[in-house]
């Protein structure tokens, strides 16, 4: 039970951090670790090519540049206001991950070369008699407390290697990667916005685990296999308040204001996206909506992104959203609607009964009537759930455009 550990540092191989190279960091595969204050290490894989780093989470690759910053090196994570700052040592790399969206949030970071490019993030040992975890698991986080919530865990296992995610009613935990060791499963993710670690042990067909996030957050979770389990329909969670009119005016990112309704949107199908650039699920959705807009804009589709951002100054909020727009190649309209708060989003949009998730997506027909509201987003890390949802949206837009 929980007998595995993170991959031990093979100090004899730690030659990549301090040796001579024409590049800032030695080339090849690396294994990084972030230390939280619960005495846990959150491992992640990355590859260095020239002066670029590619953070690896299962099928995902997040590229960023390595640069010189004062007396150290820095990797600024795209879109998210976070960065790795580190120095080279004879043993590898050592420094901190700074999450600037959270006050005083920094985690110790160290990394060592992984010359064989092995996928294992955790030490599975030589005599691993692994349990079988593949399948769908009905999951409850913080069971028996006021913070209890349901989730669908999806695990894929090939021998000792495991990937998967947890889907909730507000989104998903994106690409998780790790290992199975005897009766235990270990999964982790680092994407620049979050650092996640899931540990679980299979006891009498039930997984008992703990979820760690960032510097100090943790909560228990319990799962049992249930291929028929489904979460609440995400189209039923958020509703329009019937007495309130769908309307708003917010500043755009080009120095003006934009309103809905407006003659620009007359006889157009409109998607209204409630999001924040700090939210990985929102970034996943923005990439999807960018492609949707490219396909349907000339047929009468408009998309308006309502951003709720962390910085206090409007200029800083605009800068964050412009960064997201550039990173995703999005060509649709973005407005600054307020601060990064569900309560503030609710107050800014009184025609909704609540805003329980970033993102929340509203589909409006040519007559200005709300036809559907989708709470959360099932990103590409959810596999068939993402494929199903994106196909549903395509069909919905086709139907609305043809009306």
List the predicted regions and their residue ranges.
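C-terminal motif of bacterial Sec signal peptides marking the signal peptidase cleavage site
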Residues: 2-3
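Central antiparallel beta-sheet cores of small beta-barrel/beta-sandwich binding domains
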Residues: 13-20, 24-89, 122-123, 128-202
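Surface-exposed beta-loop interaction hotspot
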Residues: 103-141, 233-239, 245-248
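N-proximal helix/coil linker or "cap" segments that precede and/or mark the start of modular domains
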Residues: 212-251, 256, 263-267
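Short active-site neighborhood of thiol/selenol oxidoreductases, capturing the structured segment around
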Residues: 258-283, 289
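Structural microenvironment flanking redox-active thiols in thiol-disulfide oxidoreductases
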Residues: 284-329, 340-348
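Structural micro-motif
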Residues: 329-333, 352-362
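Thiol-/selenol-based redox modules, centered on thioredoxin-like
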Residues: 357-403
């Amino acid at each position: 039970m929980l007998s595995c550990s993170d991959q031990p540092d093979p100090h004899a191989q730690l030659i990549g951090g301090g040796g001579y190279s024409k590049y800032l960091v030695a080339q090849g595969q690396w294994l990084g670790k972030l230390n939280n204050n619960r005495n846990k290490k959150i491992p992640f894989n990355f590859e260095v090519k020239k002066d670029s780093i590619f953070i690896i989470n299962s099928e995902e690759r997040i590229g960023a540049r390595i640069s010189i910053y004062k007396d150290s090196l820095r990797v600024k994570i795209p879109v998210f206001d976070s960065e790795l700052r580190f120095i080279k040592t004879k043993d590898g790399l050592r420094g901190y991950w700074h999450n600037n969206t959270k006050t005083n949030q920094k985690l110790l970071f160290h990394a060592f070369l992984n010359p064989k490019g092995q996928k294992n993030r955790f030490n599975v040992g030589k005599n691993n008699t692994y349990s079988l975890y593949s399948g769908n698991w009905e999951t409850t986080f913080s069971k028996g407390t006021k913070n209890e919530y349901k989730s669908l865990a999806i695990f894929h296992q090939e021998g000792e290697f495991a990937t998967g995610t947890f889907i909730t009613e507000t989104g998903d935990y994106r690409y998780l990667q790790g290992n199975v060791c005897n009766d235990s499963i270990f999964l982790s993710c680092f994407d620049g916005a979050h650092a996640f670690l899931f540990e679980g042990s299979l006891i009498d067909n039930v997984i008992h685990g703990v979820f760690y996030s960032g510097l100090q957050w943790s909560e228990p979770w319990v799962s049992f296999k249930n291929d028929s389990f489904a979460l609440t329909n995400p189209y039923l969670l958020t509703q329009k308040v019937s007495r309130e009119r769908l309307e708003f005016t917010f500043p755009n990112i080009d120095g003006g204001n934009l309103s809905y309704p407006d003659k620009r949107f007359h006889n157009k199908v409109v998607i209204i996206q409630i999001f924040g650039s700090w939210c990985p699920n929102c970034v996943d959705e923005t990439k999807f909506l960018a492609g949707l807009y490219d396909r349907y804009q000339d047929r009468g589709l408009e998309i308006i992104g309502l951003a709720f951002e962390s910085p206090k100054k409007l200029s800083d909020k605009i800068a964050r959203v412009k960064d997201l727009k550039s990173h995703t190649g999005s060509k649709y309209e973005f407005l600054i609607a307020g601060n990064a708060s569900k309560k503030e989003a609710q107050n800014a949009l009184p025609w909704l009964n609540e805003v329980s998730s970033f993102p929340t997506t509203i589909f409006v027909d040519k007559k200005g009537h709300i036809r559907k509201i989708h709470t959360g987003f099932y990103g590409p890390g959810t596999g068939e759930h993402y494929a199903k949802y994106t196909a549903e949206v395509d069909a919905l837009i086709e139907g609305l455009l043809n009306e």
